[in-house]
Amino acid sequence: MTDEGLTEGLLISPIRNGTVIDHIKGGEGLNVLRILGLTGTCTVSLSVATNVTSRQMGRKDIVKIENRELLKEEVDRIALIAPQSSINIIREFRVFDKKGVDIPNQICGVIRCPNPGCITNTNEPVTSRFTIQQSGLRCHYCDWLITKDIASHII
């Protein structure tokens, strides 16, 4: 059987109120959940679609979070691994607000520096701080540059 002539439909049910994170690079949806602290033990109702066909992106992920609107700090975290994503606020099954994410200039307390000698990885009470650059994330304290696999460094 071919898929010619089939109508496009919803892959996951709509939510009444909450947040839909769309246009996440295919395969990154679970990392988005991780950086939001939404794990298997949370009580929030979640829907995740992975590697959905997208005309714009080829493949994308979608995350739906019922009865929760994201804070700016959470959106900034998402921007680190999904800079092309859009955040849709849903109220009574309708899109109330839709916007893209903005990559912040600096992010604190979100990324763990991979340099074992960095002051943020010692027993000192220092919060990690990274400057976002075109080439990657640069540690404010030791100048270490993270250029790939940013999701694995998220605290």
Curated annotation (Swiss-Prot):
SUPFAM superfamilies registered for this protein in UniProt: Aspartate carbamoyltransferase, Regulatory-chain, C-terminal domain (SSF57825), Aspartate carbamoyltransferase, Regulatory-chain, N-terminal domain (SSF54893)
Residues at which Zn(2+) binds: 113, 118, 139, 142
Superkingdom: Archaea
One cellular component term from this protein's GO annotations in UniProt: aspartate carbamoyltransferase complex
GO molecular function annotation: metal ion binding
Sorted UniProt keywords: Metal-binding, Pyrimidine biosynthesis, Zinc
Function recorded in the entry: Involved in allosteric regulation of aspartate carbamoyltransferase.
Record text on subunit structure and interactions: Contains catalytic and regulatory chains.
Name this polypeptide is given: Aspartate carbamoyltransferase regulatory chain
Taxonomic source organism: Methanosphaerula palustris (strain ATCC BAA-1556 / DSM 19958 / E1-9c)
Lineage: Archaea, Methanobacteriati, Methanobacteriota, Stenosarchaea group, Methanomicrobia
